[in-house]
Amino acid sequence: MHGILSLAALHLAYRHPADKPRLVCIAAYHHNIALRGFQHGISQVNDGNSDALYAFSCLNMVYVLAFFGPLCDGASVDSKSRILGEGWIPAIRGVDAVLHPVYDRVCRGPLDDLTKIGNWDQLNPDQQVVTHDDHFRSIQQVWESNNDACIYDESLYLLRKCNVYMKQFETMSSEARAEWGYNQDWSAPFIWLHATSKEYLDLLQQRKPPALLIFAYFGALAHALDGSWFMEGWGRSIILVVDELLGGYYDRWIKWPKDIIRIK
C-alpha cells in the first residue's frame, strides 16, 4: 500500500510542479515505509508474501526512474553522474538481486504474466535483419583492440537484442499483441538494465568512452518510452550527457542517437 501511495504522490508532483517539494516529501515518506516492509519481508519469504514482494519491486522501479528523472532537482546533485546511473541503476538492480528466492513462487501465482518476456531467449540479432541494427554494430570498431572488448561486446549484443525485441511489435497485429501479455516493446530497455553485466556498469561509472557510447544507444531505445511520465526526458538526457563527455572525436558514432532525439 505504501509503495502505491509513494507513486501516487510522485505522479501528483509531476502533474503539479508548484507543489512538487511537498508532494515529493510525501512520496519519500511512504517509499521509506514500503522499503522497510520489503526488507522485513525478504527476511522471511513465504507463499503468502512472495507476490507482494515482487509487486513492490515493480513499483520501486517506476519510483526510482521518476525520482531520479523528471522529478529530480538537478541543482542538488551531480547531474552527469545521476544521468549515467549513479543511484538509480543500483537501486533497480539491487532489489532485483534479492528477489531470487521468491521468483519461482511468483511464477506459479497470479503475477506470473509479469515475469514472462515472450521470445527473448530465442532472439539472436546476428541471425535477423532488423532496422537500425547496422548503427549498433558500427560502434564495435571503437573498442576492437580494447582489453575490455568482451565486456563491451556482451553489453552491445544484449542491447541489439533489445532492439530486435522492440522492433517485432511494429509489425505485430493487435490480436497477437493481446495474446503476448504484459512485457511488450516498452519493457526491452528495462530487460537490458537487469541483464547487462556489473563489469560493464563499472566501466560506465568510470566514464570509459566505449561504455558511454553503448549507454547513448541505450538512451536511443529508452527515448521510445518518452510518453510515459516516469521516463520523460531520460533518453534525451542520457544522449546529451554522453555527447558532452565524449567530445568531437566520437561524433560519427553518436550521430544516430542524436538523430533519434533530433539534435544536430
PLM features per residue range, with description:
Residues 24-39, 62-107:
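Structured all-alpha helical bundle cores of eukaryotic regulatory proteins
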Residues 20-23, 49, 84, 235:
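Residue-level recognition of alpha-helical structural elements
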Residues 40-47:
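Flexible helix-coil transition and linker loops at the boundaries of alpha-helical arrays
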Residues 84-103, 107-264:
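C-terminal effector modules of eukaryotic transcription factors
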Residues 21-37, 237-249:
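Short secondary-structure subsegments characteristic of cysteine-rich extracellular domains
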